[in-house]
Amino acid sequence: MSALFNFRSLLQVILLLICSCSYVHGQWPSLLDRYKNHEVLGAFWKMARVGERASPYVSLACILMAISQFNS
């Protein structure tokens, strides 16, 4: 089933995007900063911002998602 129609899969994709964008922004900040004001690519910069500012909550959500994946 597509991740668009399954809420659990959609949440997992969003969490993975946030974690990946935060990692990329931490390693190569200029890569995402140059597209900060771009309409489409600016979304990746925003996801990195969410991952940096809400990192304890994002980490907890990733841990809970991993536990739920192991249980299913």
From Swiss-Prot:
Superkingdom to which the source organism belongs: Eukaryota
Knockout or disruption consequences: Inviable.
Lumenal side: 27-53
Cellular component, GO, one term: Golgi membrane
Membrane topology value: Single-pass type I membrane protein
Keyword Transmembrane helix attached: yes
PANTHER family attached to this UniProt entry: PROTEIN KISH-A (PTHR13229)
Protein name: Protein Kish
